Amino acid sequence: MKERSEKLFRNRDVWFSLTVFFFIAFAYFCFVANYVLYFQETQALFVFSGEFLNQRLVKPGGLVEYAGKFLTQFYASKVAGSLVAAFFITLPALSVCYINKKLIKGTAVSFPLMFVAPALLMVMQSNYYHLMEYNIGFNVVLLFFLFAVSSGKLWRKVAVLALFPLLWYVSGGYSLIFAGMYLVYILLAKREKHSLIFGGILVAVTGVTYLVFSRLLFLEPPVNIIFYPLPFLENTAYIAAFAVLVLFLVLYPVIFRALAGLSEGKKKAWYFMVPAGLIVAAAIVLSLMVYNPQTARVVELERLVFAGRYDEAIEYQEKKPARNLIGQYFYNYSLAETGKLCDRLFEGSQDFGYGSLILPWGDVHLSRGAYFYYAVGLTNEAHRWAYEEMIVYGYRPENIRMLAKTSLLNGDYQMAQKYVNILKKTVFYRKWALELENMINNPGLIQTHSEFGEKLRLIPTKNFFVQFNEPQNNLPLIIDSQPGNKTALEYYLAGLLLSKNVEIAVDSIRKLKSLGYTRIPRYLEEAALIMYNSTGIAPDLGGLPLSAESSDRFSRYFTAYVAARQDQTKLKERMEKDFSDTFWFYFHFK
């Protein structure tokens, strides 16, 4: 049995186990929770520039942040991002494995213990505010501790003390986790003749480093010197996982020695495999519990919208509806960009009325509100929203792209070039920036561009004051200034439908033919049929015919409604089954 145990825990078995865990983490973040990674990629823009680096060099922990931002940019790719995340989540297991070999050679208890930190990191990474820099920080702690215990000679201890200020500068608050871990090791686990002396010196070095950093070298608040960039998220479950991980690492030398002693004489393979399997299984279960399907749908919808894949975004929302404001806002935006707003509005969920068309001004929606204004041709207002977002949150991929696009459309090529230059210093947005730069150098190409040419034709020709407190009031002003702006018109008409203002919506139909419409959009037809049914007077459709499909559908709806209303308790349920995608259902039940 002893030979069997020794064979099981050879290096190749450890590597096999690590590989399995790596692919579990990869599969989870690539196919299940990729929304976590993509969301983080949209929150910051990594720029290859001296200024971007210098901003991180002037504070302890800045280099860990810089490395985290560098790696986060790869989250733009599902596969590359998931590989990066899985690697840094799995790496602590390898570090712990080598640390265990230095602490007590030949003990199999290291097998389950090496999965504790990766399991906790996997659960923590399931929170979409857990940044890559946090994973890097914990890895730095373990790698430096491995360096510290790799040799028992005096020079290694002196090197640890000498390099500790550098560790603090590189990793910030994570260095204090190492200090606690190393103190426990030399005072409680190692317990050599001069342990107290080295422990006292480490405490002294820590104190002196803090004083030098806070009073001489850096202009950071003391609390940042001590804790930055440790994660302190306002989430109880996350804080609990973080606390458990920190305590586990700090006490690890004692935990390992205690368990190694208890495992003497118990060398059966399952004795170590079962706990390891349970730890990994617990990580999977807890990660799945953290998974938020509604958030995942919204972020995936944003991914499609930001990539300009509007038809895919529409189909995605209709198949997997996001029942929150942002999801429905981007669904309506995608409909507007494809000219389907009044034809397909109610095929997706509409739970927020007019609010899902235009987001109100404020910090909550600062990163998303610009898209409505961009869609209807108010490029100055879209520029303002994007600029305010940049001021508040810093460079983000979408605010810099929006600023570049609106500057180009406004003819401010110098400013457009400024934002293009920023994007040229990135990995995933450089190609797009070069395309924009080509149009800056050749403005004639803008007119023929599939996106920008159309947007130029939507820009109002008359000046007016934008009403940002009541943004829906801008739509009539846009239509008056640019009568051919069908996007603004359909936003206006969709707003009337969502607010159930049937009379004005139907009255607007008579103007459609003169604006180039050859047929009445579906949901305006349905509104017209409501008007006709309630008044008995045929509305003026401006010479456009009412489709037979809408008339037949209304007849079926009316017949079903009359039959179903005999049981008021089940009326909505029965009507929703066959008519949830009609304006009539929205009008009667929402």
Task: Tell where the protein language model's regions lie, with residue ranges.
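Membrane-interface coil-to-helix junctions
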Residues: 26-80, 86-88
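Membrane-interface micro-motifs in multi-pass membrane enzymes
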Residues: 57-61, 81, 85, 108-155, ...
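Soluble catalytic regions of membrane-associated enzymes that act on cell-envelope
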Residues: 287-457, 461-463, 480-501
